[in-house]
């Protein structure tokens, strides 16, 4: 009897402990305390110092930190738009999650995973402040302080082995301070190509998780474990300097950089038509690359010759070989007046094979459609023989990012042996002012070539964002780029039609060594004037 009583005692003890744990868990989860009171609301002026210290972490950043701006207008916008944003975000989340779930569930022998209910609730996130950084690069950097105490209802049904279980997420709280970078800024809507998101500190994430109606987060120890795991996992993926990159625009279309160089050799023309009374002509060829701001390039004039030979070579930077075309126009030079067009034709770059010489014989026409005003093609105008070579840039020379490379004054070690292309981007100027007028434009001199930007009328802080290229046979390790800001009067008859607003000479050796430089230069002969110039050096081999 003593043995059986001992066994029964142990069984009773086990049953009692089990029932006690179950009853205690149910009471802990489902019974609400009765001593809950609404918080007392008082003005800040009535708070004592200890209460103020307790409330200090909850004060918005725009109050504590002068670098942060108040953005109540964004909060009002979110409050008004949240019912519509909620539906749109949930619909997008379902569409993104569906193929991922379908791919993963066979690995775990799960029949299905479905969203029975998905809503983010009626409370939108709020921004406690926002800090904006200004840089010389084509980017916009923002650091908002985000707080979101939401009442979502996310109910997921999981079916496996003939059983169904529901998991519900409620009472979500997220406090985070992300850094959002929009770059590069481009002239195509929405005006930026990528979104870079980083977290400046570990986020605070809190939520309720129910399984079959029971709150799993109420289990002692589980809440803290889950919260720390979420913080660590999110920090490992997105804590600065790690970033989440969201592409918005196709890089090739958003930021059209030169991708190669086309070498053009004008060999000869055959059978040109007579243009003067003596039965001859003074032909020359004008070459233009479509969608390029660089002026047309010209051959020399061959006097009194209907079958001229030039054998002259030219180079053009290519941005889109699939759409750009070379336009060849033959003109008859006139000593007085404008030259007369003798014929023209075009050649699409997409017909070129990279790194392969190819000869073309182009039949000259009056216009691209062969005639004018709907008339049939005119008489024979001769032929033009040209040779082309398209050399795309190597992968090493293509731009990999938009981070600034600082220029360093040092000897040109490792200078490339072959020639290349110098890209000059004139961004903007600041505090330029003339004595008689301020209609600024920029004139660039480099190795005997000249480039000009457009004129900006009556502006002390003009923006151009214009790009120019210089084809060079060898690296410019000893040359300087002369940049001059000028102003011309918009009126006729003034005593001072043109004046200099400042200039700067930029050594190009640093660009050859470092591939890229983007900075502001103080203008000489200007009181406070500055100009922002971006330089790049690219080789074709």
From Swiss-Prot:
Domain C2: residue ranges: 240-362, 401-521
Cofactor(s) demanded: Ca(2+)
Region (Phospholipid binding): 227-509
Subcellular compartments: Cell membrane; Endosome membrane
Sequence ranges on the Extracellular membrane side: 1-11
Keyword Cell membrane tagged: yes
Residues annotated as domain SMP-LTD: 67-249
SUPFAM superfamilies per the UniProt record, alphabetical: C2 domain (Calcium/lipid-binding domain, CaLB)
Xref: Gene3D superfamilies: C2 domain
Tissue occurrence: Expressed in roots, shoots, rosette and cauline leaves, inflorescences, and siliques. In roots, expressed in vascular bundle, epidermis, the differential zone of the tips of root hairs, and the quiescent center and columella of root tips.
Transmembrane segment boundaries: 12-32
Major location category of this protein: membrane
Topology, Cytoplasmic side: 33-541
Pfam families according to UniProt: C2 (PF00168), SMP_LBD (PF17047)
Alphabetical list of PROSITE patterns matching this protein: C2, SMP
Keywords: Calcium, Cell membrane, Endocytosis, Endosome, Host-virus interaction, Lipid transport, Lipid-binding, Membrane, Metal-binding, Repeat, Transmembrane, Transmembrane helix, Transport
Recorded phenotype for the gene knockout or disruption: Reduced growth.
Binding site for Ca(2+): 276, 282, 332, 334
GO terms (BP aspect): endocytosis; lipid transport
GO cellular component, one term: endosome membrane
A GO molecular function held by the record: metal ion binding
Free-text function comment from the UniProt entry: Plays an important role in maintaining plasma membrane integrity during freezing and osmotic stresses. May function in membrane resealing during calcium-dependent freezing tolerance. May regulate endocytosis and endosome recycling at the plasma membrane and cell-to-cell trafficking of cabbage leaf curl virus (CaLCuV) and tobacco mosaic virus (TMV) movement proteins via plasmodesmata.
Family: Belongs to the synaptotagmin family.
Note: Phospholipid binding to the first C2 domain is calcium-dependent, but binding to the second C2 domain is calcium-independent.
Description of how the protein assembles with itself and partners: Interacts with cabbage leaf curl virus (CaLCuV) BC1 protein and tobacco mosaic virus (TMV) MP protein. Interacts with ROSY1.
Protein name: Synaptotagmin-1
Gene responsible for this protein: SYT1
């Amino acid at each position: 009897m003593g043995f059986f009583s001992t066994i029964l005692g142990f069984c009773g003890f086990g049953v009692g402990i089990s029932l006690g744990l179950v009853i205690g868990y149910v009471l802990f989860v489902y019974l609400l305390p009765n001593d809950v009171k609404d918080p007392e609301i008082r003005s800040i002026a009535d708070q004592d110092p200890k209460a103020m210290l307790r409330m200090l972490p909850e004060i918005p950043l725009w109050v504590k930190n002068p670098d942060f701006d108040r953005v109540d207008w964004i909060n009002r916008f979110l409050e008004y738009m949240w019912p519509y944003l909620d539906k749109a975000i949930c619909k997008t989340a379902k569409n993104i999650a569906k193929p991922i779930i379908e791919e993963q569930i066979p690995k775990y022998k799960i029949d299905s995973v479905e969203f029975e209910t998905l809503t983010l609730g009626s409370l939108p996130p709020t921004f406690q402040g926002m800090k904006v950084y200004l840089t010389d690069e084509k980017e916009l950097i923002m650091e908002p302080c985000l707080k979101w105490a939401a009442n979502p209802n996310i109910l997921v049904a999981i079916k496996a082995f003939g059983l169904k279980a529901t998991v519900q997420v409620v009472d979500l709280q997220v406090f985070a301070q992300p850094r959002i970078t929009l770059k590069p800024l481009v002239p195509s809507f929405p005006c930026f190509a990528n979104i870079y998101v980083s977290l400046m500190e570990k986020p605070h994430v809190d939520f309720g998780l129910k399984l079959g109606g029971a709150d799993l987060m109420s289990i002692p120890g589980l809440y803290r474990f889950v919260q720390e795991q979420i913080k660590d996992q999110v920090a490992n993926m997105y804590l600065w300097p790690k970033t989440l990159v969201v592409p918005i625009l196709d890089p090739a279309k958003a930021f059209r950089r030169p991708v190669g160089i086309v070498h053009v050799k004008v060999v000869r023309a055959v059978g040109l038509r007579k243009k003067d009374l003596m039965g001859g002509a003074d032909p020359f060829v004008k070459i233009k690359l479509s969608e390029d701001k660089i002026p047309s390039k010209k051959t020399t004039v061959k006097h009194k010759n209907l079958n001229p030979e030039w054998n002259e070579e030219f180079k053009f930077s290519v941005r889109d070989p699939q759409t750009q075309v070379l336009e060849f126009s033959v003109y008859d030079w006139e000593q007085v007046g404008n030259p007369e067009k003798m014929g023209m034709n075009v050649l699409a770059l997409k017909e070129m094979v990279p790194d392969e010489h190819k000869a073309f014989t182009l039949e000259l026409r009056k216009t691209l459609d062969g005639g004018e005003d709907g008339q049939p093609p005119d008489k024979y105008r001769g032929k033009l023989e040209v040779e082309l070579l398209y050399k795309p840039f190597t992968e090493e020379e293509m731009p990999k990012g938009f981070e600034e490379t600082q220029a360093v004054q040092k000897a040109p070690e490792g200078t490339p042996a072959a020639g290349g292309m110098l890209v000059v981007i004139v961004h903007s100027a600041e505090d330029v002012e003339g004595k008689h007028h301020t209609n600024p434009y920029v004139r660039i001199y480099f190795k005997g070539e000249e480039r000009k930007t457009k004129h900006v009328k009556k502006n002390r802080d003009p923006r151009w964002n214009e790009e120019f290229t210089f084809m060079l046979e060898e690296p410019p390790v000893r040359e300087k780029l002369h940049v001059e800001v000028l102003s011309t009067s918009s009126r006729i008859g003034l005593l001072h039609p043109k004046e200099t607003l400042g200039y700067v000479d930029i050594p190009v050796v640093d660009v050859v060594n470092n591939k890229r430089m983007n900075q502001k230069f103080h203008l000489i002969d200007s009181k406070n004037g500055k100009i922002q110039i971006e330089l790049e050096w690219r080789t074709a081999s």
